[in-house]
Amino acid sequence: MRMLSRNATFNSHGQDSSYFLGWQEYEKNPYHEVHNTNGIIQMGLAENQLCFDLLESWLAKNPEAAAFKKNGESIFAELALFQDYHGLPAFKKAMVDFMAEIRGNKVTFDPNHLVLTAGATSANETFIFCLADPGEAVLIPTPYYPGFDRDLKWRTGVEIVPIHCTSSNGFQITETALEEAYQEAEKRNLRVKGVLVTNPSNPLGTTMTRNELYLLLSFVEDKGIHLISDEIYSGTAFSSPSFISVMEVLKDRNCDENSEVWQRVHVVYSLSKDLGLPGFRVGAIYSNDDMVVAAATKMSSFGLVSSQTQHLLSAMLSDKKLTKNYIAENHKRLKQRQKKLVSGLQKSGISCLNGNAGLFCWVDMRHLLRSNTFEAEMELWKKIVYEVHLNISPGSSCHCTEPGWFRVCFANLPERTLDLAMQRLKAFVGEYYNVPEVNGGSQSSHLSHSRRQSLTKWVSRLSFDDRGPIPGR
């Protein structure tokens, strides 16, 4: 009999979540504008593909960086050999400068307090390994990124206790919600070691208010616990209010750099979302605590960033003309694309939480549910995936307490494909429901009593050929 470890067989990876199941269905039948026009359109992937042309243009003008040359001389052998686990100094300096630039240079970062990791997934898990032991807990506000169930729990043995937030105040964190989560952990005999937040929020697509950040700092200071701020979407805040880093609020409070709260606030960053480079696997841990930095550096040996990647990105991020233009253009394009999605949803009678950041919208489909239950939410989600052929993420996969919310991504697909997705959704809503267009605000609707016919025919009809020639053909 084949014997595997408990970690290998324990069902805490989250692969049975509807979030991952939607991906599996997409991979079986992926949409292609020529070869599979009736396939599933991927709107469950938080990738930023809107500014690749800016990076490709820079690479074309700076061939030495990609060719591993410096002053005309090859440095391939130098990069191919073992490097210090601390990372290339030039890259760490470029990285902290870019982090500061995204935050409007309101805060600065010390490269000696930065630990490089193979993506934000590794960074978050490393933080949990550093701060908590198996059987202890972290508090996370809902709704939250479904992957946290895998990233934070699977190998660490740490528990997640949700901080339940609701639509009544736009899913903002409240003192009551924090205290209730802490008390719930105590009832379960779980020692709370920290709070982890994502700012800007995934899946809400909103930035945290200054008051929320002050509240969090007061809470962790009072409880004597840590605060991890996952800020991997910090460069995606495209509308006011602007993004505020937890480090900025620490500075505003004039915290003593030797105080416990100063030492217990940490940041996760990555280039996956802001630069659209998830395949490069570049993440970072930032902490004011020397012991955390030392421990994380040791653990980073299990997930290093290649020296070739560091060299290329060091050259790219050190070009201030590029970074200034990229940040501004990225904001502009994200705002335009988000507006397009919101407009398309409104034509189907569907509204969204008012968002100002991220690569997705938090979409309100409560009025389309058969009943106010998570069973009804899953029923609607299955129709959208299997009949409408759109992969979106149901709120239940994000641990939302209210049925009927969905995360819909907009930056990972061409504009033409987004148009097609909105046509499919509008046809679906018109077929199944009686819903007026939204002109701002939520809408109520009634289930259509007409015969519910298969949507296969109209899905087939909504191909690009029916909407005119493809530009450039």
Curated annotation (Swiss-Prot):
Alphabetical list of InterPro entries matching this protein: Aminotransferase_I/II_large, Ethylene_sulfur-biosynth, NHTrfase_class1_PyrdxlP-BS, PyrdxlP-dep_Trfase, PyrdxlP-dep_Trfase_major, PyrdxlP-dep_Trfase_small
Modification sites for N6-(pyridoxal phosphate)lysine: K273
Enzyme Commission number(s) from the entry: 1.4.-.-, 4.4.1.14
Pfam families noted in UniProt: Aminotran_1_2
The name this protein goes by in its record: 1-aminocyclopropane-1-carboxylate synthase
Record text on activity regulation: Inhibited by L-aminoethoxyvinylglycine (AVG). Inhibited by L-vinylglycine (L-VG). Inhibited by S-methylmethionine through a L-VG ketimine intermediate.
UniProt pathway: Alkene biosynthesis; ethylene biosynthesis via S-adenosyl-L-methionine; ethylene from S-adenosyl-L-methionine: step 1/2
